[in-house]
Amino acid sequence: YIDLREKFNIPSECKIIMYLGRLLPQKGVGDLVKAFSRLNSDIKEKCYLLIAGDGVDLENCKRLTRMLKLNNVCFTGSVNPAQRGNYFAQCDIFVYPVNYYQGWCDVWGLTLNEAVQHGKIVIATDAVGSAYELIKNGVNGFRIEAGNIEQLKSAILDALSQKIAWTAMVKDVELKKLFSYTEMGKRYIEVVEKIVG
């Protein structure tokens, strides 16, 4: 177990807004940094943006963070797959800001499943296929337009102001069960068996 607050010096009163995944241009992490920068300073002081992962866009995101003079942003680097659950367990809000990039979108986005499994408020874009199945807008999170930084900022504010119940995801057993790895595996096998005959 790694205590993220201790490891990254995050005050106990701060809400942790997290992205976990590869840092690539199509993942939209720069949009998340920009949306975070647009929050009022009194709100930013009560939040910490944790960007967990590594990739070709890491230096661009760090540069953007410096340019916007953001203090409450932490880049963790690569996360051991065995520790992913630990990261999800300790964040308050998970953001998956994927963009349409050179015709690319995230057909499913398993990372969103993990956030749902851990009972987190989730914010994802319409470029993430699983967002249509996993997110009940205003109930357990928000699905926003890809690349729309103002919508992303508003969704973060709504999540922080508890316009949706913080316990909604924990209680939404139906979604958690429906999209668990076990259930998804069973449905995948059923589809393959139907195709193979």
What are these regions (language model features)?
Residues 1-10:
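A short helix/loop element that forms part of the nucleotide-sugar donor recognition site in Leloir-type
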Residues 11-27, 33-36, 50:
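Conserved donor-binding/catalytic core segment of Leloir-type glycosyltransferases
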Residues 59, 80-91, 117, 136:
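Short acidic alpha-helix that forms the nucleotide-activated donor recognition element
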Residues 59-83:
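Nucleotide-activated donor-binding/catalytic signature segment of Leloir-type glycosyltransferases, i.e.
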Residues 112, 116-117, 121-125:
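Short hydrophobic beta-strand element within catalytic cores of glycosyltransferases
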